Design a protein with these regions (language model features):
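Short helix-initiation/N-cap motifs at beta->coil->alpha
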Residues: 79-88, 106, 182-186, 263-278
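Hinge/lid segment of periplasmic solute-binding proteins
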Residues: 104-158, 167, 185-190, 198, ...
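Extracytoplasmic/periplasmic substrate-recognition and gating elements
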Residues: 42, 65, 69-70, 75, ...
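Conserved N-terminal structural module of periplasmic/extracytoplasmic solute-binding proteins
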Residues: 2-17, 21-114, 125-131, 173, ...
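C-terminal capping/gating helix-and-loop segments adjacent to ligand/active sites or protein-protein/ligand interfaces
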Residues: 383-400
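Alpha-to-beta junction loops
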Residues: 74, 92-103, 116-118, 199-201, ...
C-alpha cells in the first residue's frame, strides 16, 4: 500500500475548503429559497399568481402594490405554479415550492405529516389572529396543538331544496318555512311526494368523477362507517364494513325502491347543478355557496333554500371542507412574518374600510348576477370578529 505525504498547510487548506463546502451545501439544504433581494427586503414568493392578463391578475397586482407600500421591508415575488399532487411533493423535496402556496383541507394533514408546511402558531399569535380564529376550522390545520396552515375559506355540506317544488308537494309549514327531513328515510319519503306531485326527481345524487364519493362520505359517516383506522404508524382502510354497505343500500334504494333519482344517473359536479338549476330535481346535498353554481341556469333566487343535512341511524354529521394557504417549511422567520401579513391583506378578522368596500362590491355584483346571497357560509373567524358581524349584517340587509 502506498502512502503519499501531504504538506500540512495544503492539508489545512483542503480541510477548510471542505468545511466551507459542507457549510454552503448545508445552508442550501436548509433553505434553497432566497431570503432577501438586492435592497435587503425579505422576499415572499406567492403561488397561484394569475398568468393571464385580466381582472384577477390586476387585482393581485393592486394588492401587491398596496402591501409593498405598507410593508417596505418585504417584496412580493409572483409564482404562477399552483398546487397539484403530481408536482407538489417533488418540488417540496427540492425546496422549490413558493413561500405561500394554496391547497385544500383534504391535503393538509398529509402535507403536515410530510413536514412541508411551516409552524405558524407563534406568528398568528404575535399578529393577534390566533384567538380570533374559528376553533373548529383551526383543528383541521393543527397537529399536536400547533397550527400549520391558514384557512381562508370553509364550508359544511347541507341540503339544498327547490322552494317551488316543495310547495307543490305540500311540504311547507303554515308560516312559509319548509318542512325538514329529520333523517334519510324521511328524505326518501319527501322525494316520493315531490315526484308524485310534480313528476320531477325528488333527489339528486352525483355518481361520476370524484363527486359521488365526496358526497357519499357524509352519508356513510351517518351510518357509522369508519373509512380508516390507524394501525401503528400506518393507516388501514376499514370501509369494507356492514355500516358502509347499509349506506350504499340506501343510495341503491333511492333508485330502485323509491325511484326518486333522475333518469340519467351519470351525474358529475356540473350536471348535478344543471339538474337542480333547471328545476329537474328538488333536493341536493351541497355547500352553502351552491347558489353561485346554478346562476347560469337562470334559477330564481327565491326558489332556492338551504337546510341542515338529515341525520343517519348512528350519527348526525356532515362534511366540512375548505381551502388553506400554507407556508413553505423552508421559510425563514422573517418570511413567515411577511407571509402572514400578506395573507392578512385579503383575509382579516378586522373591519377595515377596504374590507367594507370589497364586501359591498362583491355582494352587489352577485345580486346583479341574480345570485342568492342570504346563505352564510362557515367562516375562518369566530363569531366575535367585526368583519364577520359586518358581513352577516350586510347579507341580512340586502337579502333577496
Amino acid at each position: 500500500m502506498e502512502f503519499k505525504m501531504i504538506n500540512a498547510k495544503r492539508l489545512l487548506a483542503l480541510l477548510t475548503l471542505s468545511a466551507l463546502t459542507v457549510s454552503v451545501l448545508g445552508a442550501c439544504g436548509k433553505n434553497s429559497i432566497n431570503d432577501t433581494d438586492e435592497n435587503g427586503r425579505t422576499i415572499i414568493s406567492v403561488g397561484s399568481w394569475p398568468s393571464k392578463d385580466g381582472a384577477k391578475k390586476q387585482n393581485m397586482e393592486d394588492r401587491r402594490q398596496r402591501f409593498e407600500t405598507e410593508n417596505t421591508d418585504f417584496v412580493i415575488q409572483p409564482d404562477n405554479w399552483s398546487f397539484d399532487l403530481k408536482s407538489f411533493y417533488a418540488k417540496a423535496a427540492g425546496g422549490q415550492i413558493p413561500i405561500v402556496y394554496s391547497t385544500n383541507f383534504t391535503e393538509v394533514s398529509q402535507i403536515i405529516s410530510a413536514g412541508y408546511s411551516a409552524d405558524l402558531t407563534n406568528e398568528l399569535k404575535k399578529q393577534g389572529l390566533y384567538d380570533k380564529m374559528n376553533k373548529e376550522v383551526l383543528d383541521v390545520v393543527s397537529k399536536d396543538g400547533r397550527v400549520y396552515a391558514f384557512p381562508y375559506a370553509a364550508y359544511v355540506l347541507g341540503l339544498a331544496y327547490n322552494v317551488n317544488l316543495f310547495e307543490k308537494a305540500g311540504l311547507m309549514n303554515e308560516d312559509g318555512t319548509p318542512k325538514q327531513p329529520k333523517d334519510w328515510n324521511e328524505l326518501a319519503e319527501f322525494a316520493v311526494k315531490i315526484k308524485k306531485a310534480t313528476g320531477v326527481a325528488g333527489f339528486i345524487f352525483p355518481t361520476a368523477s370524484n363527486v359521488g364519493g365526496w358526497i357519499f362520505t357524509s352519508v356513510a359517516w351517518s351510518y357509522g362507517t369508519e373509512f380508516m383506522k390507524k394501525d401503528g404508524d400506518k393507516w388501514k382502510a376499514t370501509f369494507d364494513s356492514p355500516e358502509a354497505a347499509e349506506a350504499l343500500r340506501f343510495i341503491k334504494d333511492l333508485k330502485w325502491k323509491y325511484d326518486v333519482l333522475p333518469s340519467n344517473t351519470f351525474i358529475d359536479y356540473t350536471e348535478q347543478f344543471k339538474t337542480f338549476g333547471t328545476g329537474q330535481g328538488a333536493m341536493l346535498i351541497a355547500a352553502g355557496d351552491m347558489p353561485g353554481d346554478v346562476r347560469s341556469y337562470d334559477m330564481n333566487p327565491d326558489s332556492i333554500g338551504m337546510m341542515m343535512i338529515p341525520r343517519g341511524p348512528k350519527e348526525h354529521v356532515t362534511l366540512m371542507g375548505g381551502s388553506v394557504h400554507e407556508v413553505s417549511n423552508k421559510a425563514s422567520d422573517n418570511q413567515i412574518e411577511g407571509a402572514i401579513k400578506w395573507i392578512k391583506t385579503a383575509y382579516s378578522p378586522d373591519l377595515t374600510e377596504q374590507f367594507k368596500e370589497n364586501r359591498e362590491k362583491d355582494i352587489n355584483t352577485r345580486l346583479e348576477n341574480n345570485e342568492l346571497i342570504t346563505v352564510k357560509s362557515m367562516s375562518t373567524w369566530n363569531s366575535e370578529s367585526e368583519a364577520i358581524k359586518f358581513d352577516h349584517e350586510l347579507r341580512d340587509k340586502l337579502a333577496n
